[in-house]
Amino acid sequence: YCTRQILPGMVRRRRGHIVNIGSVAGSTPYPGGNVYGATKAFVKQFSNNLRTDLLGTPIRVSNIAPGMAETEFSLVRFNGDAARAAKVYQGAQPLSADDIAEIIYWVTGLPPHININSMDVMPVCQAWAPFAIHRQEM
């Protein structure tokens, strides 16, 4: 609904950049993440289709897809179980909200003729096999 409200003004002004936050889970599944992954796959496809619909305008659309990021996500996922949520990040160095903000700042600061369609971002401790996490010995 936010896009629907703000997009007409962007088109009229002939400037703007819509940044959607997806997830690498929208491209690669993980156990127990079926609904979350499906919604993030939608965000990616919505972003791609919106950019296609805006072809011929200078409006940019980007989908930023973080991997493991230490946010309230795990706390919500585990119904408020703080100990279980903390174990997700134990021994790893996940992305932070500041890291994602820095990426958004960079993407939106590029010259106006450049559009980053989608960007997968993971901490170096994470890989695609499937979302394997290397943990340091504690």
PLM features: what roles do these ranges have?
Residues 63-67, 83-130:
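C-terminal helical subdomain
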